[in-house]
Amino acid sequence: MIQQLLREWPPGYGGVERVAHELASVWAGSVSSFDVQRRAGAEADALPVSYPRQVLPCSLPLGRLSLPLPSRPLWRLLCSREPLHGHLPSPGVLLVLLLARLLRPQRRVSVHWHCFLDPEPGLNGRLFALYQWVALRSLPWLSGVVTTSPLLARELVRCGCRAERVMVLPCCLSREQEQQMLQLPPRQRRSSTDPLRLIFIGRLDSYKRLDWLLQALATLSGPWRLEVVGDGPRRSAFEQLGRQLFAADARQRIRFQGRLDEDGKRRCLARADLLVLPSDRCNEAFGIVQLEAMAAGIPALAFQRHRSGMGWVGQLADLPWPQTPEALPAVLQQLAADPVLNARLGLQARERYQQLFARTVWEQRLQCLYPAADASG
């Protein structure tokens, strides 16, 4: 069995937690978490959990920085002979991985590199820049590196990782999620007078840039409707922006659904023609919700940013666009005006999902890649 370590409590709602959850469902090993947001026992699990979990005591966060505290669970994790797979970015996780490797040099200790961090101003930004510098220089000392897209793999190699130690394992859906999404019928082609039905799914924070989507929608000449699934500190600001841009029409055109469970999210996806994820940072590096949309037969739009695989996930042959914020209004207008293209892209999205991201494809990759990543110890 392979043990895992991550910052937050799985399965949660974030990409890192979901990846750890799916790995644990196959590996059946224990999952340790610092649970910085204190979610263990405070809320129901978003997905069924079949593996053991434990919380490792950690320091109170300084900004986003939280480090493990000495404890018996930590000592047992460090001294175990079982393979250990840690999820970055997290200074605390990196510290434990390095200590585990130091205590048992022959132990298999690998890392999942989920994203690079954009530089930010202030003390926090400098601390995380230092962390990323240390992390990149520590990777060759570990048994192997798994990342989520070919773009991130190339960037890791460019930063000094040996190519044979870097493995690509895209994110995946659970078997149940995949089955439910694939069972949704193909979208019926809407008429030219029907509104384009868009959906945004994610935490309502500054870097998700829902404001860019709202501003792009304000330029469209045809009818549209937007469902916003998720909650966060910027919700009221985004609601206010919607009222400023669309006045009395805002309530009719935009529905803020808040956080929904998996069934509620699936119902929203079943109504949608298009998913848009306009994130502006490379720490949004994959976007698992794109897989849900693509499996459901919905094209997904995301920006292709430096050190991110977001744009790569949903790229479709019949929609060549620059994948930049500046190009978003034009591509939305194109899809709003061409229902035939929109329907064809939905079929292509499902086909791309089945070829690259299907659960069976992921399981085959996992079976091959993880032993290869750790073969040398």
Role assignments for model-derived ranges:
Residues Q3, R189-K208, L214-A218, E227:
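Conserved donor-binding/catalytic core segment of Leloir-type glycosyltransferases
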Residues R108-S110, D118-W141, R175:
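Nucleotide-sugar donor phosphate/pyrophosphate-binding loop at the beta->alpha transition
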Residues Q4-S66, G232:
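N-terminal strand-loop element at the rim of the active site
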Residues E239-D263:
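Nucleotide-activated donor-binding/catalytic signature segment of Leloir-type glycosyltransferases, i.e.
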Residues A295, P299-Q304:
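Short hydrophobic beta-strand element within catalytic cores of glycosyltransferases
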Residues G314-E326, Q333-V340:
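Conserved acidic donor-binding segment of nucleotide-sugar-dependent glycosyltransferases
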Residues P70-S71, P83-Q106, S110-D118:
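An aromatic- and histidine-rich active-site surface loop
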Residues L151, C171-C172:
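Carbohydrate-associated surface elements
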